[in-house]
Each structure stands twice: as C-alpha cells, then as structure tokens.
Amino acid sequence: MISSTSVYGLKMQWTPEHAQWPEQHFDITSTTRSPAHKVEAYRGHLQRTYQYAWANDDISALTASNLLKKYAEKYSGILEGPVDRPVLSNYSDTPSGLVNGRKNDSEPWQPSLNSEAVYPMNCVPDVITASKAGVSSALPPVDVSASIGSSPGVASNLTEPSYSSSTCGSHTVPSLHAGLPSQEYAPGYNGSYLHSTYSSQATPALPSPHPSPLHSSGLLQPPPPPPPPPALVPGYNGTSNLSSYSYPSASYPPQTAVGSGYSPGGAPPPPSAYLPSGIPAPTPLPPTTVPGYTYQGHGLTPIAPSALTNNSASSLKRKAFYMAGQGDMDSSYGNYSYGQQRSTQSPMYRMPDNSISNSNRGNGFDRNAETSSLAFKPTKQLMPSEQQRKFSSQSSRALTPPSYSTAKNSLGSRSSESFGKYTSPVMSEHGDDHRQLLAHPIQGPGLRAATSSNHSVDEQLKNTDTHLIDLVTNEIITQGPPVDWSDIAGLDLVKAVIKEEVLWPVLRSDAFSGLTALPRSILLFGPRGTGKTLLGRCIASQLGATFFKIAGSGLVAKWIGEAEKIIHASFLVARCRQPSVIFVSDIDMLLSSQVSEEHSPVSRMRTEFLMQLDTVLTSAEDQIVVICATSKPEEIDESLRRYFMKRLLIPLPDSTARHQIIVQLLTQHNYCLNDKEFALLVQRTEGFSGLDVAHLCQEAAVGPLHAMPATDLSAIMPSQLRPVTYQDFENAFCKIQPSISQKELDMYVEWNKMFGCSQ
C-alpha cells in the first residue's frame, strides 16, 4: 500500500519500506547502543506511528495523542550522557536521577578530573586534544578546519580566521591546520587592538566535548571540501614573541575622528578573564589613525553635534541651517527670529500657520515665530548704517520686531531719497497670499476685491510723502514685548468679554459668519490709569498683529498741521502690515460734539478718521481692528457712537488687583512687609486707579533714600539702603491721593448703563 501526504504543499509518496528505515540502523532493545542512538530510534517510531499515520487519517486524534504521550515519556526518560569519552567535569560517581522519577538509562559517570586526564603544560594551557582516535579516523585529515565553537563532525569549506596562543619558553603548539590556508588580511588592516597572544600561526581545532553520535560512529560522512582557493592578498606575518601589534594603515589615507568621543576603531577589548594567572592581560595600543574611509572635502563650516530631541521644530531648524550653508534657502528665513512671539499661555488665540511663503514674510509681529505677517518694507537693501539704526534694539530683546526703531525723526526732517523706494509687499508676486494670514480667508468675490484694493493701496502709498511713512514707522508703530492676559491685574470680566465678543469672531470668522458682524471697532472708556492701553496691546499680541498707537491729544496739539495726513498714512501702513491693531487714545478730542467749525483742523481730522474707520468696517479683506479709548465718553457726539460696535467700561482695580499690583512693583526693591501690612495697604488704596497705586509704590520706594544723610548719592551703593517699610507707605499716603472722584465714577456707571455693553 502506498500512501501519500502533503508537506508544505508538496506531494510526497510514502511506502512501508521507508518506515522501516530506523529499525535497519538502530535497535531500541539493544543494550550496546548509546542513549543517543535510542533517541534516534524513538524519533523514527514517532515519525512512523504518529506523524504519518495521523496525516493519512489511519488513526484517530485520540490514538495519536496517546502515542505522542507514550513516546514523549520514553524520549524524555533517556538522559544523554558520555559513553566512552571523559567529560571535563567533576560529577559524583552516582548518576543523577531524573526529576520525573523515571529510570535512568545512561551509563555510570566517571569523574574526569584526575592526574591522568590533565595535560602537562609549561605556561599556557593547550587546547583540548581531539576526542579520540575513532573520531579523528572518522573524519578526513583535511576536514579538521572548524574553528572554536563549531561542530567537529560538520566540515567547513570556508576559510576561517585561525589564531594560536603565543609560545612561552620552548613549548610550541602543534598545528592541525597545516594543510589549510589561514585567514589573511590586507595591508590596510589595523591590528592595534588585536589580542597580544594572537599570531599568524594556525590554531588546532577544538573538538566539541559532545560529538554527534552519527559522526562518531562513522554513519554519516560529509563529502570532502573543495581545495582551498589561493590567497589573493598578501597576509600579515607575526612572530610568536610579540607583546602587541600595531599594523599601520596602508590601503587608505588616515582620517581623524569626526567628533569628540567618536572612535571608528572601536573600544579596546576588556581584560581577558579566561587567561591563566601566569599570563598578563594584553595592553592595547591607542590608535593614531583611523583606516579605511575617505570623505569628500567641502567648504562648509562643521556643524557642532547637538543632542537629539522629539521636537519636529529642531529638525526643521537643522535642515534650514544646512540649506543655508548650501545656499539653497531663501534669505528671508532668517527674519523669523526677530519677530515678536505670541504668548504661550493662551494658545486658543493664536493665528494658525497657513504655509505662507518665505518671500512674503515681513518684519512685523510673527504669527508663531516662523510665519510673519506682511510687512511694509523698502524694495532696495538697507545700507549698513540704516540697518544699525533699524535693528539697534534687537541685541537686547529678541521679541522686539526689527521694524520698530528707538530712533525718533523730527517732524521737519525729510528723507533724501525719493518715495519710490517704498513698495507694498501686497503687490508682490505673492500678493494673493496675504489672504492666508487669518485662519479662514475670505473666498469667492472677496479675492477680486482684495486684488483691486491692493492696487489702490499701492497707488496711494506712492503718492504719500516719505517723511509721513517714516513718522508712522518710527513713532506710531509701538514696540514692546508681547502682553498676556496674566500681565493685566484684575479686569476678569472685561477680559472674558473681549475674548468672547472680539477675539473669537476675528480668529474664527467661519464659525461666526452670518451670525454677527466682526467687531472691528471697540471703545474702551473709564477712568485714566486703569489699563486701557495695556488691553489694546494684549489684543494685538493675541492676534499677532502690529500695534499702532495714535494719541488724540498729540494730533490736536503737536501735529495739528499734519494730523489729517498722519491718520491717512497710518491706515495705509496698517493695511500693508495686516493684521493690525490701531489704538487711538483720547478719541473724545477728535469726535467731540463741541467741534462746530466745518473747515477747522480738528474737523478735517475727524472727517479723515471717520472715513478710514468706515472703510475698515465695510471692507471684507482688511484685517484691521480699531480700538479707541477715552476718559470722557459723554463728550463723544451722539451720532458717532454707532461707529463703535463694542463699548466696554474699564473700572478701577478691585482689592485683588491692587494687591497684585503692589506685590509686582515691590519685587523690584528690597522691602520688609508682613501680611497684615499688605492687607492695610490694600484697604487704604480703595478708590485708587492702577496708575495711582504705581505712583504710591514709587514714592514709598524712595523713602530709604530720603532717610540717608545728606551726602553724595553717587557714592551710595544699593546694598547700603534699608528695606522699604510700612512707614514709607505712610509717608507716601500724605503725598499721593486718588485721582478719581466719586462723581466721575457714578458718571461712568450711568453712561455704561445707557450706551455701554452689559458686563
């Protein structure tokens, strides 16, 4: 009967003659066979009675399970041990029993550590001799080429590296590999860290302490290996008495290490623990050159290695730095580090990055320190003197935009260059990209309207006087670090209203589209010194916008002749630096109902301001927010209140805010106040504005100076001054009084009830 089975998809023919093959070679019941032979016999029975029978459905699953259990028990009951060869161990004469309690079929063990089993040695222990003459005779003489750790029965036809121990005295180790070529190395091989006992002599093969019974009995004989190939490269020659080796690199030019701590040659090997006590551990020579690799020369400056981190931003910076060295990166990339960064404590109000090209980045407030808004900049390169003037303040404050300048130009000064050097970046080849400044740019017809408006802005800029642009850039655009909500003491209700009714509709116009108009104009009214300007700067920081600060009193008193043109130029520059926040203080001086003359300078200023404000309110593409502040809201013309979509009252600071202001101001000085004295200060400053509290703390801080004897103040060191005490505040209360009367406070409350937004 011929049965067939499928193993891994291959059809195999099986006959009973095949099943009888193990019995033709092994006999389980024989008493002369070694345990290893019995194991092979059990494997044959397993294959015949279990695997193939079960595969052909000759037996059931239960029968197969019983057979598997039976032969597994017999298989595990055989303990393979040494038969006719000594074992390098010191076991007892009685063989160990099995854990499962079965009979031990192995032969009694004989201790091998005796005087006859130890080879006499002079200084270095020789390799263990071949197992026996029977094993050696079973293998061809040329087949003893396996290195340490390989099986003596499996001949290798590969040339392996062979080493021999160095000689000590007159003892020479015989070689069993004389007929085989040793592993040879090219002249470029650096042997600085080779073992001191290695040489080019062949190493006798170490036979396995447990040779396979098939090979030891001569049943399986591998074919002889092919003749060894001739050596292609000259080998190195070593003598037997060298203490260490250092082969110079000849194939490749030497190359020094790339960076500190990098060693291409690898670390020297640790001291050998297996060496006899009579032989010292090898002492490696430090490598002087690194062989084998050459690097293409380049003119780039080496980059210092930096620590690896998980920030994607680091990889981008490293990539940008590398590209800068190759000259493939846009030069405008370097502008990102100058821009004013957004506060990290309020990520909800950050403008998202919409992949604005590098060529369209300006020097205004950055969105996230990498994507900046459109900037109004000259087309030609600035001269070194101009660059020093423009960016002189950047060395001390990295958050300040470079477009801000500390130098002030006089009103009568005019630039010697024509206005033609100024062009609007909106009209650049990436002019349409400015629509990506907000998270959700206007779509549809608004794009065509923006293009036409850009042409109009560019034409108006060309017709504007140069010194007006300089005046707006140097004096009206205000520099300063970003302001966060935590920098403003108190005013929690006002902050919440601004966030919900001003910032959210501007930042997420898609979510608020169709529900309400964008609040592009805000009126902040209240007593002086309550933080209206600080709120305007905070809104600009949250929007990532350029902050324009126009003083209404300065327009009327200082710039009365050019106030109309200054307002016009300010809005033009704001359109070029979108998003922008224009803050106008003392707006009551421009919009007062007492202005009656139609052609007066104040009337012309008001007309120009209202025209520009109306353009901002009706424009779909302008990203400009106008914030006006006043301490006299009742003087604003009733017909002009409609221009302000939000009218918010900024009240006096409460007790918590006053405590925060006092602590913040005193941290700059040395003071000695306890909690009770702080509570008294907060109580006595009831009715003070934030500016009044600041004046009080400044007056108290100079108290230690007044207590000093009448000497030269230049010789007094700060450490010589005593701390600020509560008595200094007592003296300051005699000089500083609240600047807001109760009548004014009542007026603000009434006006807020009538015309303000409920808070």
From Swiss-Prot:
Stretches the record annotates as Disordered: 89-111, 200-237, 258-293, 337-429
Residue ranges with Pro residues bias: 221-232, 266-289
SMART domains in UniProt: AAA (SM00382)
Species lineage: Eukaryota, Metazoa, Chordata, Craniata, Vertebrata
Keyword terms of this UniProt record: ATP-binding, Cell cycle, Cell division, Cytoplasm, Cytoskeleton, Microtubule, Mitosis, Nucleotide-binding, Nucleus, Phosphoprotein
Tissue-specific expression: Widely expressed.
Family classification: Belongs to the AAA ATPase family.
Keyword Transcription included in the entry's annotation: no
GO biological process, one term: cell division
Subunit structure: Interacts with AKAP8 (via C-terminus).
Protein name: Fidgetin
Residue numbers bearing the Phosphothreonine modification: T400
Disruption outcome: FIGN and AKAP8 double mutant mice die soon after birth due to cleft palate.
GO cellular component: centrosome; cytoplasm; microtubule; nuclear matrix
Keyword Nucleus: yes
Annotated organism of origin: Mus musculus
Gene Ontology molecular functions: ATP binding; ATP hydrolysis activity
Entry-linked InterPro entries: AAA+_ATPase (IPR003593), ATPase_AAA_core (IPR003959), ATPase_AAA_CS (IPR003960), Fidgetin_ATPase (IPR047828), MT-severing_AAA_ATPase (IPR050304), P-loop_NTPase (IPR027417), Spast_Vps4_C (IPR015415)
Highest taxon of source: Eukaryota
Biased composition regions of type Polar residues, renumbered to the chain: 337-347, 382-418
